[in-house]
C-alpha cells in the first residue's frame, strides 16, 4: 500500500474515507464538504480525511492533498495497476485500525450532492452505539437499477430486511464493524464492485446495531455505462454470500425495517439524467440471452424456460413482470448452489436483468417518481411473497442444501 501522510498523523478518533479512481474533477469539492462537516459538528475530536485511491493516472491524489482543509489528510493507494473499489476499502479499513479510530464513514468520490449535514447524520449515530448506517436517497427513477431489481428486493424477500439502499456506497460504521469485515473471507468480486453488498450483507449477519439516514437528494456520475461488469460482481458477491449462509433463510420471518436515525434538511431536487432508451437496453438483453440460455436451458423448469423462449427467441419483445422476475432470480440462485456453471448462471441472470430493466422502463415511463417508487416497493413485496418458490426447491434438495426450517 502506498501512503502519503504529510502531517504524520498516527492516531485519530474519526476517519472519513473517500475511495476513488480518476476523480480529480470532483475530489476537491467532496473533500471540502467533508472538512466543513467535521469543523461544524466534530471540532472537538481528532479527525482525518483519507483518500483511498487506485493510483489514479489523472492525479486524483495530488488534487486531494492540495485541497485546503483544517483537518489533516492522508492519501493511500493500491500499488501498481491494482484496481477495484473493494481493494480501496480494504486499505481504508486497515488504515482505520492503524489509527485506532472508533468512528468512520465512507462516501463515493463522484457524489455531487454531499453537504456538511451528511457528515453529522452519518457519524453521530455511531457515537450513540450504532455499528452500521446505510443511506436512504431520493434518486432519479431510473438510477440505482441494480439496487431496485436485485439487491433491495432480494434482501427484502429472502433475509427479511427493508434495506432500501444496500449498495449506496455512502455509509458509516464503528471500529467493531471494521474488525468484523476484516475477519471475513472476501470473495474475489468483493475486491471490485461487489464490496458494497459484501459490507451490507456481512453487517446483517454480524448481529450488530444497524440503522439508516435520510440524505435527501443524490447527485452523482451516472453508472449506466458500468452496469455490465457492476452487475456481474454485485450478483456474484451476493449469491456467494447467500449460498454460504443458508442459516439466514428461516422458514418464517418478520420483516425488519431499519430505524431512521437522522434526516438531512433541504429541498428535494431529482437529478436530471440523459434520456434512457428502453430499446437499447432490450437489444442488449436480446443479444446476450441466446448463448447464456443455450448452456442452461435443460436446467430450467418449463414455467421459467417457456416464457423466456417466447419473449427472447420467438417474439423478441420483452415483458418481464415483477412477479416473474422474482421467480427467475430465485430459480437462478438455486441453480447457482447446485450446478458448477456459476459464471454462466450469473451471465444469464445479467441478460435477464437487462430484460427486466427494459420492461420496468416501459412500465414506468409515464409514471412520476412517487409512483415508480411504489412499483419498486411492490416488487420487493413480491420477492417476499414468492420466497417459498426458492425455499420449496431447497427443501427438496438433499445433503448440503437442506435448510434449517425450524
Q: Each PLM stretch: what is its role?
A:
Residues 236-406:
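Terminal low-complexity segments of carbohydrate-biosynthetic enzymes
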Residues 53-62, 111:
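A conserved acidic beta->alpha catalytic loop
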Amino acid at each position: 500500500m502506498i501512503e502519503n501522510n504529510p502531517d504524520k498523523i498516527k492516531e485519530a478518533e474519526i476517519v472519513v474515507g473517500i475511495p476513488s479512481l480518476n476523480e480529480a474533477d470532483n475530489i476537491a469539492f467532496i473533500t471540502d464538504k467533508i472538512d466543513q462537516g467535521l469543523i461544524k459538528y466534530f471540532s472537538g475530536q481528532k479527525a482525518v480525511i483519507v483518500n483511498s485511491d487506485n493510483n489514479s493516472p489523472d492525479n486524483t491524489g495530488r488534487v486531494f492533498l492540495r485541497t485546503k482543509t483544517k483537518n489533516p489528510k492522508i492519501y493511500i493507494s493500491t500499488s501498481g495497476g491494482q484496481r477495484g473499489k473493494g481493494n480501496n476499502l480494504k486499505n481504508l479499513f486497515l488504515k482505520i485500525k492503524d489509527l485506532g479510530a472508533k468512528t468512520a464513514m465512507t462516501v463515493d468520490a463522484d457524489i455531487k450532492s454531499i453537504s456538511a449535514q451528511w457528515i453529522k447524520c452519518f457519524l453521530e449515530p455511531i457515537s450513540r452505539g450504532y455499528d452500521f448506517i446505510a443511506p436512504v436517497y431520493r434518486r432519479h427513477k431510473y438510477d440505482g437499477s441494480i439496487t431496485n431489481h436485485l439487491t433491495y428486493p432480494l434482501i427484502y424477500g429472502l433475509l427479511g430486511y427493508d434495506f432500501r439502499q444496500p449498495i449506496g456506497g455512502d455509509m458509516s460504521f464503528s471500529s467493531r464493524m471494521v474488525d468484523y469485515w476484516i475477519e471475513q473471507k472476501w470473495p474475489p468480486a468483493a475486491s471490485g464492485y461487489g464490496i458494497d453488498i459484501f459490507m451490507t450483507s456481512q453487517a446483517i449477519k454480524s448481529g450488530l446495531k444497524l440503522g439508516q439516514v435520510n440524505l435527501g437528494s443524490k447527485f452523482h456520475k451516472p453508472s449506466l455505462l458500468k452496469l455490465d461488469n457492476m452487475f456481474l460482481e454485485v450478483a456474484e458477491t451476493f449469491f456467494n454470500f447467500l449460498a454460504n449462509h443458508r442459516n439466514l433463510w428461516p422458514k418464517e420471518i418478520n420483516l425488519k425495517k431499519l430505524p431512521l436515525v437522522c434526516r438531512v434538511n433541504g429541498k428535494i431536487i431529482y437529478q436530471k439524467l440523459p434520456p434512457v432508451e428502453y430499446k437499447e437496453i432490450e437489444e442488449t438483453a436480446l443479444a446476450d440471452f441466446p448463448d447464456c440460455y443455450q448452456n442452461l436451458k435443460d436446467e430450467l423448469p418449463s414455467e421459467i424456460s417457456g416464457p423466456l423462449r417466447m419473449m427472447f427467441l420467438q417474439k423478441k419483445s420483452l415483458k418481464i413482470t415483477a412477479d416473474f422476475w422474482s421467480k427467475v432470480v430465485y430459480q437462478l440462485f438455486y441453480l447457482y448452489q447446485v450446478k458448477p456453471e456459476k459464471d454462466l448462471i450469473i451471465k444469464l441472470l445479467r441478460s435477464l436483468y437487462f430484460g427486466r430493466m427494459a420492461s420496468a422502463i416501459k412500465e414506468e415511463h409515464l409514471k412520476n417518481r412517487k409512483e415508480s417508487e411504489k412499483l419498486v416497493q411492490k416488487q420487493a413485496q413480491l420477492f417476499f411473497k414468492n420466497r417459498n418458490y426458492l425455499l420449496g426447491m431447497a427443501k427438496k434438495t438433499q445433503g448440503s442444501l437442506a435448510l434449517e426450517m425450524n
